């Protein structure tokens, strides 16, 4: 009886070892294969905004303000794009019910602040150090600070009185870079700065 148990145990161990050796496979490459991390959209920023249902309030705001040409421009820019959730919060916080209720001068100023005059892609080596905001000029003449955390989550106006997190970053249309976020952003003075506007 002992011999039978011993034989069965040895047989099972042998079969187990044989199966474990057969199930091993050779890895083709021991180096990490990098994939491109930017999504090339092959369209203008305006075409992307028009084709995305979650940006319908932003699209309507651009049309009411008649700023479509700024989103079709051929020179590069960075487009900070608030999604529908952002506009719902903006409506609630500011007492508006629709885009049409926002006075056009306020709407134009807000939209121009959401266009940075430089291409800011968070894969840029100049932005490699985390938590180091860089000042950029916007189309309305104010300054926007862009940076990222150590986990490469994009931040707007870090180090100021109010900062925001970017939800989706580094979308690359033909005319710049798009960063989508859940908030309508505004100029925020650097912490300790008593000036209302630069």
Where are these regions (language model features)?
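Bacterial N-terminal signal peptides that target proteins for export
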Residues: 1-13
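Second-shell loop/turn segments in exported
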Residues: 42-49, 69, 94-100, 167-168
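Edge beta-strand at a domain terminus
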Residues: 175-180, 185-198
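Bacterial N-terminal signal peptides
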Residues: 11-21
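Beta-edge loop/turn motif
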Residues: 54-130, 176-183
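Aromatic/histidine-rich interaction motifs
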Residues: 100-165, 187, 197-198
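Short, exposed beta-strand-loop hairpins at the edges of beta-sheets
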Residues: 167-175
């Amino acid at each position: 009886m002992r011999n039978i148990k011993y034989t069965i145990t040895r047989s099972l161990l042998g079969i187990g070892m044989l199966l474990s050796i057969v199930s091993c496979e050779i890895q083709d490459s021991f180096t990490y294969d990098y994939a491109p991390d930017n999504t090339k959209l092959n369209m203008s920023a305006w075409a992307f905004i028009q084709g995305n249902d979650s940006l319908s309030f932003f699209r309507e705001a651009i049309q009411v303000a008649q700023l479509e040409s700024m989103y079709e421009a051929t020179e590069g820019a960075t487009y900070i794009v608030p999604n529908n959730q952002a506009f719902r919060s903006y409506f609630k916080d500011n007492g508006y019910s629709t885009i049409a209720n926002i006075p056009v001068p306020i709407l134009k100023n807000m939209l121009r602040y959401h266009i940075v005059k430089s291409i800011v892609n968070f894969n840029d080596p100049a932005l490699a150090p985390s938590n180091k905001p860089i000042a950029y000029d916007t189309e309305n003449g104010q300054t926007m600070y862009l940076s990222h955390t150590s986990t490469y989550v994009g931040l707007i106006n870090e180090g100021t009185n109010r900062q925001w997190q970017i939800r989706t970053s580094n979308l690359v249309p033909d005319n710049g870079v798009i960063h989508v976020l859940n908030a309508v952003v505004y100029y925020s003075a650097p912490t300790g700065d008593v000036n209302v506007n630069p």
